[in-house]
Each structure stands twice: as C-alpha cells, then as structure tokens.
Design a protein with these regions (language model features):
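Juxtamembrane/disordered regions of integral membrane proteins
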Residues: 1-137
Length: 137
C-alpha cells in the first residue's frame, strides 16, 4: 500500500458515504419507511458502525481493483467504464435479487438502481481522476 492508494481509499470512502446518505437517507428515505421493512431510525443508529465498516471495505475494494487495472488511457472514460462495470456486477443484481425476495415496490427498485448507478459512475470518475496519469502502457 502506498500513500496514493490510502488517499484514494479515503476519498472514495467519503464520496460513497455522502452519496449513500443523499440517496438512501434523503431521496429514498420516505419510500423505505413506507415499506415497513426498515429498522426504526433510533435503532438504525446502533448499527452505524457496521455501515461505516461496510463502506470502508467497499471503498477499499473499489480503489484496489481500479488501481490494479488502470491503463494509460484517458482517465474519465476509464473511470466511467469502471463505475458502470461495478454497478452492473454488484448494484443492479443485488437490487434485483432483493426485489425477488422482499416485498418492495417496483419503482423503489428502479430508483435504487438508477441513483446508485449514477453514484457508481461518479465514484468511478473520482478514483480515475485520483489515478490519472498512473496507468500502464
């Protein structure tokens, strides 16, 4: 691990936490509460350490995979492709699987996928910006 990786990991973690807060804590909050599947907000606070740990792991993996595969190509396109690839690999299937096993409205799932896809594209661009000019030829 080098300094660039640690800085990128921290930045990606912050972006993911803030993005998650905006998407799930604000934009989708009322829809989540209407499902009756979520913990009461007071109870959720007791699980915040697990939420932080999940985002630390996710940000570290996201950064590590990108850093290992970055090429000497334009950073923005590379970052957007990376964000899209991870969204298609993780985000879309997870929400579709949840939709199959949990009684959530179809429009909620569509919004989850759309918002998180946008966030993954943005995070891909962020990590690519941080690693610009660092790729292999």
């Amino acid at each position: 691990m080098n300094k660039k990786f640690l800085v990128a990991w921290l930045v990606v973690f912050i972006v993911m936490m803030l993005g998650g807060l905006v998407i799930h804590g604000m934009l989708l909050h009322d829809e989540y509460m209407a499902t009756g599947l979520m913990r009461p907000e007071a109870e959720q606070e007791g699980f915040m350490a697990w939420m932080v740990l999940a985002h630390v792991v996710m940000a570290g993996a996201f950064t590590w995979i990108y850093a290992r595969g970055v090429e000497n190509k334009p950073w923005l396109g590379q970052g957007l492709r990376f964000g899209l690839a991870l969204a298609l690999f993780c985000t879309v299937p997870i929400y579709l699987i949840y939709y199959c096993v949990q009684p959530v409205p179809e429009m909620l799932v569509i919004r989850q996928i759309a918002y998180d896809l946008i966030m993954m594209l943005f995070v891909g661009a962020v990590v690519a910006f941080l690693y610009r000019g660092q790729g292999r030829a």
